[in-house]
Amino acid sequence: MANTQAVETQAVTDTASVGEKNALRKAHDYLNYTAFSYTGLIGQLEYEGFTTEEATYAVDNCGADWFEQAEKKAADYLNYSAFSYTGLIGQLEYEGFTTEEATRAADNCGADWNEQAVKKAKEYLDYSSFSRSGLISQLKYEGFTTEQAEYGVTQNGL
């Protein structure tokens, strides 16, 4: 299978313009560094000065699994901040992932949403003062269920 893919990739790049080939190399560089959505990677390549056509060619031919990219991006987000299930989906959609990609990533990320509520509550308490009910309301606004919000607040001593 790898040989077939290599032959197909070679056939694609044989007909590509220099700009398309350069955009494809840059797309691979970016994907080796971090996760992108389909539209996010096109936007990044355009920011780098590639035309829309070159960027689209590169993204169409880079071989990325966009579901896998969404899962990687979800893991990246959860490594530095806390999210509710719906909040994570919303953030991934904001980054350009489809609803299906974002939902699957949230479903498969392995997050304990109660623990995410604990972490998010702590993030808020590190920067501001809240009453118990005020923090529960804030967590619910962030997309946590009532049960998750109450758990998060309780675990933080409120």
Predicted regions and their residues:
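An alpha-helical, amphipathic repeat domain used for nucleic-acid recognition
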Residues: 5-158
